[in-house]
């Protein structure tokens, strides 16, 4: 069985042969981490075009190795809150073994094309595997237009521990600008659409990232308040959805502190 180091070398070779990205001429690194970075840069930049069976077999083997390198996190491992149907998980959303995780997507729905970018869209697309971008391309081709803010789309999660990914596009807030009622409602719509889609698909566990608070600039405090208030209201309006467990995933200590505070009933944003 080839090592991850060797698999990366073979994948890089195949991707560079295509000459589809700006990194195609980079020399093959001798260090594992540098190979990982180069492979990720190549696959991040690659257009949503079919891939060879040889490449996909190598990627499957590499991402299977990645998947085996950690213990997935289930709902029972998540932090309980004062609400029986709401949980918190502080860490990497890629490690969650739930029915679906929510990806903060962009309007193209094809993932992040910036090499090795730190956004959640990049991380999810990279480690779910290249089939995810192709699946999203099929959705966008059928749809025939950019994805609207506040909608939701469902795909397989491929190599991630989760079964599915729900993709939603949140609103942008220009730095220094206040949150208008329209943008607040658009963010709330992301949560409602994702919950509606989860129920329609028969899912029983759904993990939300902090939608729009990264590259899209939505203030973290207001975003957390909107997220919690919207989910609680949706649950109250959908008593038949009691089987759906909702997890709020936080990645920064600031986000965790906000959700810890607002999920106490005396501070519940309602």
Swiss-Prot record:
UniProt cross-references to InterPro entries, sorted A to Z: Macro_dom, Macro_dom-like
Ranges annotated as spanning the membrane: none
Cofactor(s) in the UniProt record: Zn(2+)
Annotated Gene3D superfamilies: Leucine Aminopeptidase, subunit E, domain 1
Comment on bound cofactor: Binds 1 Zn(2+) ion per subunit.
Superkingdom, natural source: Bacteria
Positions bound to ADP-D-ribose: 92-93, 106, 119-121, 212-216
UniProt binding sites for Zn(2+): 112, 117, 119
Macro domain location: 73-267
NCBIfam families cross-referenced by the UniProt entry: PRK04143.1
Protein name according to UniProt: Protein-ADP-ribose hydrolase
The organism of origin for this protein: Streptococcus pyogenes serotype M1
């Amino acid at each position: 069985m080839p090592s991850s180091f060797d698999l990366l070398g073979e994948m890089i070779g195949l991707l560079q042969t295509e000459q589809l990205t700006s990194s195609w001429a980079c020399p093959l690194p001798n260090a594992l981490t540098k190979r990982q970075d180069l492979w990720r840069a190549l696959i991040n930049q690659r257009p949503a075009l079919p891939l060879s069976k040889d490449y996909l077999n190598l990627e499957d083997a590499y991402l299977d190795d990645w998947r085996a390198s950690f213990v997935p996190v289930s709902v029972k491992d998540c932090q309980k809150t004062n609400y029986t149907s709401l949980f918190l998980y502080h860490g990497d959303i890629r490690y969650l073994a739930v029915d679906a995780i929510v990806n903060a997507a962009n309007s193209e729905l094809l993932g992040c094309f910036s090499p090795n970018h730190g956004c959640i869209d990049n991380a999810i697309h990279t480690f779910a595997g290249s089939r995810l971008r192709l699946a999203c391309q099929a959705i966008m081709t059928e749809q025939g237009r950019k994805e609207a803010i506040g909608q939701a789309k469902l795909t397989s999660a491929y190599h991630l521990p989760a079964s599915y990914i729900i993709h939603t596009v949140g609103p942008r807030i220009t730095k220094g600008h206040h949150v208008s009622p329209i943008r607040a409602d658009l963010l709330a719509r992301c949560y409602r659409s994702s919950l509606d889609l989860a129920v329609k698909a028969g899912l029983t566990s759904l993990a939300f990232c902090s939608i729009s608070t990264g590259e899209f600039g939505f203030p973290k405090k207001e975003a957390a308040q909107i997220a919690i208030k919207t989910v609680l209201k949706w649950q109250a309006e959908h008593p038949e959805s009691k089987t759906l467990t909702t997890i709020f995933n936080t990645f920064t200590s600031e986000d965790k502190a906000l959700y810890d505070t607002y999920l106490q009933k005396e501070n519940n944003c309602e």
